[in-house]
Amino acid sequence: MKFFKNKIVWASPVIAFVIIFIFSLTAVPTVQPSPKDLPIAVVNADEGFKAPDQEKMNAGEKVLENIREKSGTSVKWVQVASVEEMKKGMDGQEYYAGLVIPKDFSAKQASLQTAEPEAAQMEVVVNQGMNTAASTMAGQMLNGVVDQLNQSIRTQVMDGMVNQGATSLSMEQAEVLADPIEKKVTNVHKPGENSANGNSPVSLFQPLWMASLGSAALIFFLVRKGTVSSRKQSLLVKAGQAAVGVVIALVVGFGLSWVASDIVGIHIPDYMDTAIFLAITSYSFYLMISAVLAILGSKGLPVFGLMLFFGLPLLTLAPEMLPTFYQDWIYPWLPMRFMVEGLREMFFFDHGLVWNGPLESLTAIGVVSLIVLLLSGFIHGAHCIESEKFAFDNGKTT
């Protein structure tokens, strides 16, 4: 039978396996993600303490040395000068969490072996708006650090009192030694309710991407069906293609904001700012897809399908939690990350619609794509002229 002689029939199992292999790779980053160089701020305001006839001690410095030795490569400890500097860094999404050692930490630790002990206090600050999974993990790490310090200090104090010949503890000492370090946990930039557990920026990506991809592909096929006979006409068609994209982008931006807010129920702090940002994002993606299709033709469509399947799992994770290959070679090339980063700043950091890094990147993508799209019209128009000249010369020769 001719059916079994067709090479595609015998190649179909191999093609099926390749498809399975490619799409299985999208799940790799989400299987037991582990952090690497997760930035956590540390403020050591400890002024130290000097007992009579003894050298000055600084327990805060010892704490820093201890946590740096035990954390390995999972955490990048960044020591900052003050709480204000740490909060400024969190506003700029530089740290997932922070640990504050107070100025009287050494003095209160030294008081634990006296008749009037006082518990020291450490503050754990969690920057929830950056990334839910990463900030939660960073907060758990810092809580573990404080718990280990509590146990270590309790053991040291008890051993010291035994060595001094103490046989019993006062009620005050027993109460303080139960928790020699009081832990205060503060959450900043909280996503709040109706935020998909902090993933609302990622939730908006898929519908916007599909709308931009579908509309760009539709206009591309409509343009391809038409015929152009001059360079000027080809340029006008490409300019019209870009102009139609403006209308589509406005519909996508304002429509998605309305659907997300009023139908899905996602909390959007500022409807107008969000709608304009989504419109700019959609237009940038529309131009990018149109430019690629103008160069590669319909062969370029699978590229954007793969970007969707590979990008969606990566966008839910912090870059520091991705495998090295994905972190260095996949994530930086995902244009949709600028959309998620921009929405995160608007939703959780109260930045509003401002000229920042994500908006700059999206604008740059759109401008470059528009230039490529118009150049493709110029080149295509030149081909049309050459084809007409060739046909005319052949007819004249004949």
Q: Residue ranges of each PLM-predicted region?
A:
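Solvent-exposed, amphipathic alpha-helical segments
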Residues: 89, 257-258, 342-346
